């Protein structure tokens, strides 16, 4: 199965940091955000990754490309560990492809841009703003990996969800399921989706996390999706049409997620991952403990 990762967005929520740097290249500890996303996909067994990109995002392509000059320098200076880290950014059996989204016409349009590469077959979509903590769930067997497994067993499209505080439902796409009592790793049939409902009208507190596995049926629906909110082609509109044609399931996320397209979420992720850094984690813990004394 291939995965589409839309990276054409301008990252306005993270300005001024993203004025000259793609938001996906902002670092968490010592890796850019997009590296965590690719690692998740690879751990889930995906071998073909399609970036839907923009002319300002060359740094992403460069990050995953071979840097002969850098590798030669590290080899000459006998920095073997760093050389191995650079060379292992993308496993040899994983193929990365890049497709341009010429105009910013929304997430639905971005996904549709990947059709020529993916072909008329099932595929996954992973939004790069959201990192799933690999220290709270096993990416080889849970979350995206489990969604792909569930799809292969049932042929039902999967949408990852997680509970959010009731007062925050208006910030998210919310799913209406036959039951609200699904636990981590479980699924439930979706009756409908509501984009950023009011607190009073929210059918549940299960918010879409940014991981999808779609049947090939979604392609024709995306092509027929009219321009919606913000003069954009909305992925949620296509999913609503998909729900009318076939079973679509909500898959309950396991563990924690960080919204790194939001400044506070990004800061939280940075601290959490830095505390667990293999080399610097213990020293960083001491720094945080000292800082905490003055709060």
Curated annotation (Swiss-Prot):
Its EC number is 2.7.7.9. The keyword Transferase applies. It comes from Haemophilus ducreyi (strain 35000HP / ATCC 700724). May play a role in stationary phase survival. It is an enzyme of class 2 (transferase). GO terms for biological process: biosynthetic process; UDP-alpha-D-glucose metabolic process. Belongs to the UDPGP type 2 family. This is UTP--glucose-1-phosphate uridylyltransferase. It catalyses: alpha-D-glucose 1-phosphate + UTP + H(+) = UDP-alpha-D-glucose + diphosphate. Keywords: Nucleotidyltransferase, Transferase. InterPro entries: GalU_uridylyltTrfase_bac/arc, NTP_transferase_dom, Nucleotide-diphossugar_trans. GO terms for molecular function: UTP:glucose-1-phosphate uridylyltransferase activity. Gene3D superfamilies: Spore Coat Polysaccharide Biosynthesis Protein SpsA, Chain A. CDD domains: UGPase_prokaryotic (cd02541).
């Amino acid at each position: 199965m291939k995965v589409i990762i839309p990276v054409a967005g301008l990252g306005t929520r993270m300005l001024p940091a993203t004025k000259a740097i793609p938001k996906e290249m902002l670092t968490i500890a010592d890796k850019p955000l997009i590296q965590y996303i690719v690692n998740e996909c690879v751990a889930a067994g995906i071998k073909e990754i399609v970036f839907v990109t923009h002319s300002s995002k060359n740094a992403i392509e460069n990050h995953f490309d071979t840097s002969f000059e850098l590798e030669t320098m590290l080899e000459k200076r006998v920095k073997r560990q760093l050389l191995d880290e650079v060379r292992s950014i993308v496993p040899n059996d994983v193929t990365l492809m890049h497709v341009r989204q010429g105009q910013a016409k929304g997430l639905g349009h971005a996904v549709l841009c990947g059709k020529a590469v993916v072909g008329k077959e099932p595929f996954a979509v992973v939004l790069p703003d959201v990192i799933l903590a690999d220290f709270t769930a096993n990416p080889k067997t849970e979350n995206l990996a489990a969604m792909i497994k569930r799809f292969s067993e049932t042929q039902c499209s999967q949408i990852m969800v997680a509970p959010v505080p009731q007062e925050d439902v208006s910030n998210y796409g919310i799913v209406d399921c036959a039951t609200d009592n699904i636990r981590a790793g479980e699924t439930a049939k979706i009756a409908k989706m509501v984009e950023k409902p009011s607190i009073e009208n929210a059918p549940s507190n299960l918010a879409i996390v940014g991981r999808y596995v779609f049947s090939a049926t979604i392609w024709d629906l995306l092509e027929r999706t009219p321009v919606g909110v913000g003069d954009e082609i909305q992925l949620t509109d296509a999913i609503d049409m998909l729900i009318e044609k076939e079973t679509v399931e909500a898959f309950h996320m396991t563990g924690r997620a960080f919204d790194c397209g939001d400044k506070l979420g990004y800061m939280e992720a940075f601290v959490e991952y830095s505390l667990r850094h293999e080399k610097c984690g213990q020293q960083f813990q001491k720094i945080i403990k000292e800082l905490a004394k003055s709060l």
